[in-house]
């Protein structure tokens, strides 16, 4: 049975507001740092986040090519949601949907995109899963298939090389997307097909990963034994665009659920372990798309609560916190989401 998913697609350009601060000027010598010298610089020159040395080649396998920063790949129609433009007095200092919607298991789920730049599809599918649950008040619990999007939406981008979250939401609207899940799992139509890289605690070891994975081919059929057909398992929505501000992002998250951010990644992010990330040093390495679920403040520093897609043993149990209000790394410029009506 199709669950009609009416979506509000956001492509958000963030201008300067009263909550924002100017971007920090990074010294040229700091911009050129890499490897251990970069880790040592971060340990000595900033206190917002903890770092640990991470191999950069493996890190790059999980990023998109910089060409996907293209801001022109957006819907033609712009629709302004007047309800989100009302006064902002009711925006709390902190908001975490995992508290309000603790029964929505997808909010706690951290996927593993492996050695594929599929973050644009993985994060979009994850946000869609959350919003279906929130709209149904916890009654509808599904994981939307990132594999269906990354393999079958040929106009969304180039699979494992990268793509646009805004196009992933349009694909949901035009064709519908089936259910999915993690690698080698059952109970859904199209689970993820690329195995996790390396060791992850007591979980099954599938092997190491060398280079970027090839994009799995599109299969318009469900796993053998799954009780639904591919067409009957699809979830649909209606897509359009919304005018943006940081407060509009917050209000939309409170009203509808998580959104997706696309931002420029520098090498210092490769070494993030915990805390509030704010770009401090290192070279530009690619693009990444992530699911933004809420926000908060720690010792006067505002942040976004973000779910990554690099397994739950990365960062803060798969999550990280991103500096809020400074548009660091362009984080607040390009956001997409869908709201259920």
UniProtKB/Swiss-Prot annotation:
Please list the residues annotated as glycosylated: 103, 202
Cystine bridges: which residues?
Answer: 104-133, 116-160, 152-218, 153-156, 189-222, 197-209
InterPro entries in the cross-refs: Papain-like_cys_pep_sf, Pept_asp_AS, Pept_cys_AS, Pept_his_AS, Peptidase_C1A, Peptidase_C1A_C
Task: Give a yes or no for keyword Glycoprotein in this entry.
Answer: yes
Q: Which Pfam families match?
A: Peptidase_C1 (PF00112)
> What keywords appear on the UniProt entry?
Disulfide bond, Glycoprotein, Hydrolase, Protease, Signal, Thiol protease, Zymogen
Checking PROSITE patterns in the record gives:
THIOL_PROTEASE_ASN, THIOL_PROTEASE_CYS, THIOL_PROTEASE_HIS
Single GO biological process annotation from the record: proteolysis
A single GO molecular function, which one?
cysteine-type peptidase activity
Enzyme Commission number(s): 3.4.22.-
Q: Which residues form the signal peptide?
A: 1-19
Please list the residues that make up the propeptide.
20-88
Catalytic positions?
A: 119, 288, 308
Q: What does the UniProt record say this protein does?
A: Expression of the protease correlates with blood-feeding and suggests a role for the protease in blood digestion.
Sequence similarity: Belongs to the peptidase C1 family.
List the protein's name: Cathepsin B-like cysteine proteinase 1
Species of origin reads Ostertagia ostertagi
Gene symbol of the encoding locus: CP-1
